[in-house]
From Swiss-Prot:
Protein name: LexA repressor
Native source organism of the sequence: Clostridium acetobutylicum (strain ATCC 824 / DSM 792 / JCM 1419 / IAM 19013 / LMG 5710 / NBRC 13948 / NRRL B-527 / VKM B-1787 / 2291 / W)
Highest rank taxon of the organism: Bacteria
Active site: 128 (for autocatalytic cleavage activity), 165 (for autocatalytic cleavage activity)
Subunit record text: Homodimer.
Function: Represses a number of genes involved in the response to DNA damage (SOS response), including recA and lexA. In the presence of single-stranded DNA, RecA interacts with LexA causing an autocatalytic cleavage which disrupts the DNA-binding part of LexA, leading to derepression of the SOS regulon and eventually DNA repair.
Catalytic activity line of the entry: Hydrolysis of Ala-|-Gly bond in repressor LexA
Single GO MF descriptor: DNA binding
Keywords of the record: Autocatalytic cleavage, DNA damage, DNA repair, DNA replication, DNA-binding, Hydrolase, Repressor, SOS response, Transcription, Transcription regulation
Length: 204
């Protein structure tokens, strides 16, 4: 009986943690986050608890999607979600969303983004856009497009390197302006715009 009591307590902790994460963040935790929260080192043990919660009709899982845990009897979990690929590298002449370029996926509520077409995510490295509220380590949600207007924050390819800057077309040059007064703009004859900033996701 003692073992049954411990099992029920752990399952309750897991269920409440999932519920709180959905309430606070809009999406469920990963299995590793559940491990850390309830003090379990084995992901297979957590999967076992999730399977039992599923059999009890408390949750529903989709094995084809990351973080796809739905709390069946809880209305806060009924939001539609979207999986956005996190791209590790961007290279000229190569499809951005090629399988080999995708490092992971981020699952967020659908209402967090205005346009769900051709979205991908790049992790921000550096401080060139801090005055626009974009910080090192942020996840930039990018709408794939080759078109940009002056003042748009874009992802541009320059000599096979991707950079996020504010775009300005000036006569026969293009100015890629950082949002950091200590840094100089990048002036180029041409560049390939591959997307525009659609939003920022920050993990705390």
């Amino acid at each position: 009986m003692a073992t049954d009591k411990i099992t029920r307590d752990v399952q309750s902790e897991i269920y409440e943690f999932i519920r709180q994460e959905v309430l606070d963040k809009g999406y469920p935790p990963s299995v590793r986050e559940i491990c850390a929260k309830v003090g379990l080192s084995s992901t297979s043990t957590v999967h076992g608890h999730l399977s039992r919660l599923e059999k009890k009709g408390l949750i529903r899982r989709d094995p084809t999607k990351p973080r796809a845990i739905e709390l069946i009897k809880d209305p806060i979990s009924k939001r539609e979600m979207i999986d956005i690929p996190i791209v590790g590298k961007v290279q000229a002449g190569q499809p951005i969303l090629a399988v080999e370029n995708i490092d992971d996926y981020l699952t967020i509520p659908l209402n967090f983004v205005r346009n769900t077409n051709d979205l991908f995510i790049l992790k921000i490295s550096g401080n060139s856009m801090i005055e626009a509220g974009i910080y090192d380590g942020d996840l930039a949600i990018i709408e794939k497009t080759n078109y940009a207007q002056n003042g748009d924050i874009v992802v541009a390819l320059i000599e096979n390197d991707a950079t996020i800057k504010r775009f300005f077309k000036e006569k026969d040059k293009i100015r890629l302006q950082p949002e950091n007064h200590t840094m100089d703009p990048i002036i180029v004859d041409n560049c390939e715009v591959i997307g525009k900033l659609a939003g920022i996701y920050r993990r705390y």
